């Protein structure tokens, strides 16, 4: 139950059942974690077909209920990793409002849709919108491939930082 690294550790959750998520968060309570991260970004078909990860982006009302419960249960930081939408951005503004209503502490935003996977061009304008709209820091994710691209994209979007995915392994 000790964290020997002296570095913050987050537990990432994926799921749609509120009671299961509540039980999991309570199971984490005795451990020295810095916070809970809700994954709303996974684009894997075997995941989103179960209406979890990026699949939940089709249901902003359900996300609101999950985040309300998490905000109530989590005394540490509550963060969210999400994409700009499932097949398009029709719920994007509503999702940003959900982030504000539930007082999320950090939003990591992948600038593509779930169905866009890793093939489509990232929409960095959505990151700019999120930075202006939410009351928490926003990390940009999507095609951050180097220090140079990270710096350029942070300047372009005003994001507070970047989250590096696949390129972290390649580099």
Predicted regions and their residues:
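Flavin-dependent oxidoreductase catalytic cores
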Residues: 1-171
